């Protein structure tokens, strides 16, 4: 579709991992396609950050944003994350919603009339981050640093493969169960999520899980 629209496109904005199906998209291929038609490419990584390995700089993604309260465990209301490729951070003419926390740190408190952006993704910050929320987020990031995304990804693949096996075993064990996993079977095309169609069994299944204390 990107090639079909061609130079009609200015920006390609896409979800890196679909929240409904659990499908992980090939962000590198999407970025390359967008750049070939002259578009900037960005991603909503709300369901990908902390879930799958991301190489935004190497893929030459122009920008991305994500929340941290899901897989990154910073709790509801946790600070958001932002990526801007280094190719763009020195462009002071680039339009942005500018705030004082994105101003050159050396001159921030001089209260000058002109905005002087930091030459990094920091220049897109509007105000200072909430300290207590950042403390919770930092505790989670420390664990990620200690374990590493490669190890997390390997564990994720093992767990989802086992869950996929169990769901299929349960579905095939009785004529009264018919569960369909709509998340891609290829581990490289999904994250930690398996989405299931219950085919008419949703309410009974919901009631059973609720009775057992499953949220």
Residue ranges of model-derived segments:
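Pyridoxal 5′-phosphate
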Residues: 1-215
């Amino acid at each position: 579709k990107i090639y079909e629209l061609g130079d009609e496109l200015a920006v390609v904005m896409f979800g890196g991992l679909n929240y409904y199906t659990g499908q992980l998209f090939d962000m590198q291929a999407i970025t390359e396609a967008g750049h070939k038609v002259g578009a900037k490419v960005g991603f909503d990584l709300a369901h990908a950050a902390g879930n799958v390995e991301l190489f935004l700089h190497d893929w030459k993604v122009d920008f991305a944003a994500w929340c941290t309260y899901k897989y990154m465990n910073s709790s509801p209301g946790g600070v958001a994350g932002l990526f801007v490729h280094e190719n763009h951070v020195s462009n002071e003419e680039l339009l942005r919603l500018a705030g004082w926390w994105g101003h050159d740190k050396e001159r921030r408190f001089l209260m000058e009339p002109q905005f002087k952006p930091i030459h990094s993704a920091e220049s897109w910050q509007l105000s200072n981050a909430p300290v207590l929320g950042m403390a919770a987020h930092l505790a989670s990031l420390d664990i990620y640093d200690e374990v590493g995304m490669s190890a997390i990804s390997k564990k994720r693949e093992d767990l989802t493969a086992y869950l996929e096996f169990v769901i299929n075993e349960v579905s095939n064990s009785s004529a009264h169960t018919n569960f369909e996993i709509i998340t891609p079977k290829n581990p490289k095309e999904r994250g930690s999520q398996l989405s299931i169609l219950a085919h008419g069994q949703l309410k009974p299944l919901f009631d059973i899980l609720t009775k057992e204390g499953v949220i």
